[in-house]
Amino acid sequence: MAPPLPDGNDPRPFPPLPESGDIDAGTYFVPVAGHTEPFEITVPDGWFALDGGSLGKDDPDHPAEWAVYITLLPVNYVATDACTWRGALADDGPSAEAFVDAMAAQSSTASTLPVKVTVGNYSGFEFDHFVEANVDMNACDGGKLCIYSRHTQACSRWYSTRGERETYRVVDLNGKRAVVAVGRIDEAINPELMREARAVFDSIVF
């Protein structure tokens, strides 16, 4: 089914990204919490959405769901320790730099050095985030690594496998940050699928 046309009074040329279900190929807009303008994302066939905050695509040759994914969730709290995260979700402040610093300081995970990037007219940072080699995920709270959350008492974004890895892009939107990421469930994912996911990630325009 084709995506709905924008409302006649809406100046945006694209429809909103569906909150759940299969996504038709096309360009969509996504609201940013605390910012007046949405961003745009272009998605090919075969992707699906979940809860308005994530996009995913399966690898037919891999047993796991969500082989590759894009996350668009707002971040209010970062776990100081991703393994023992219950009671350790800390408010990292509203800036892009604060998020980068909190992720780099997080125990049980590791980050690459952040690289400065420009997305449209906005500046930001990009870095990779992944599980530390010596972490026993079965011993972690809930059997998972909590990366960040929208709330203090529950986890919004977590890793469930040791091979999970993400590339984050955090953009400063005139004092309000936007956080987006592209990831894979483990290293066995088809490289072509990962390249497709990266192209979706790179299509994001603020």
Model-predicted segments: where are they?
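Generic signature of intrinsically disordered, low-complexity, basic-rich segments
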Residues: 21, 26, 92, 98, ...
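N-terminal targeting sequences that direct proteins away from the cytosol to non-cytosolic compartments
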Residues: 1-76, 82-83, 152-163, 169-176, ...
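Extracytoplasmic/secreted proteins, especially bacterial periplasmic and envelope-associated proteins
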Residues: 94, 98, 102, 192, ...
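Signature of long, low-cysteine stretches enriched in small and polar/charged residues
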Residues: 97-169
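Post-signal peptide N-terminal regions of Sec-secreted extracellular proteins
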Residues: 63-96, 107-110, 134, 139, ...
